[in-house]
């Protein structure tokens, strides 16, 4: 059994070696899995490969105990990594058998994945696969463009296929939701534990770390990024 390093390293597209055995194929595919998004870019997942099976674990050492006290977003992030793994496997011609582990386990295991028989890819899979290395979390202000016609309905259908629910927010309740979000932000920023946790994952632009949030992700200059962690920790923006 081998625990696999899971930092999201600088990525370049490659071809799955035809000679690779099951463990080598899985290790290769995990290069796509770890490009999934996560809150504060904490990358809260770990993988173990044994034979033709890879096991997905939540890495609770990277849990955000203040902003995510029930580990809800940690589990969602691991689910995103699992989806990337499935998409990459399908792109390279493999079906996957996924067993989601129900309930909480002491070792944090969330799922088991095996590669199954060869299969053909689809245009939808190829579109998702091409997006994996280009996906970025936008931490900058959003623009005012509306999504293309039909996109929200398509996303809702895709969510339902995965057992989830996407509920669009209509214009009539958008302001109420925005006010709730703004009030939640104010309450969080008044909490020194929240600010300390956020500061711990805030990086300068010169960081060599592959996790956390560098200043350039928020459009900051190099100079501003050096003082950002201190300002985050000390500034009580909830009373501004």
Give the location of each predicted region.
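Acidic, surface-exposed loops and disordered segments
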Residues: 1-240
């Amino acid at each position: 059994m081998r625990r696999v390093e899971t930092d999201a390293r600088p990525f370049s597209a490659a071809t799955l070696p035809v000679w690779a055995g099951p463990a080598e194929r899985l290790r290769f595919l995990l290069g796509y899995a770890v490009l999934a998004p996560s809150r504060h870019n904490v990358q809260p997942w770990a993988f173990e490969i044994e034979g033709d099976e890879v096991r997905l674990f939540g890495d609770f050492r990277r849990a955000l105990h203040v902003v995510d006290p029930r580990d809800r977003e940690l589990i969602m992030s691991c689910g995103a990594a699992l989806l990337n793994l499935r998409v990459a496997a399908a792109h390279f011609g493999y079906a996957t058998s996924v067993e989601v582990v129900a309930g909480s386990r002491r070792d944090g295991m969330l799922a088991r994945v095996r590669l199954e028989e060869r299969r053909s890819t689809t245009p939808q899979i190829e579109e998702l696969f091409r997006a994996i290395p280009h996906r970025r979390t936008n931490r900058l202000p959003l623009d005012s463009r509306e999504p293309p016609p039909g996109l929200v309905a398509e996303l809702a259908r895709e969510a339902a296929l995965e057992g989830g629910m996407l509920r669009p927010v209509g214009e009539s309740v958008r302001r109420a939701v925005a006010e709730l979000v703004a009030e939640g932000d104010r309450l969080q920023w008044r909490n020194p534990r929240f600010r300390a946790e956020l500061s711990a994952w805030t990086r300068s632009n010169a960081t060599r770390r592959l996790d956390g949030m560098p200043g350039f992700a928020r459009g900051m200059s190099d100079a501003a990024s050096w003082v950002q962690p201190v300002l985050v920790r000390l500034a009580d923006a909830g009373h501004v």
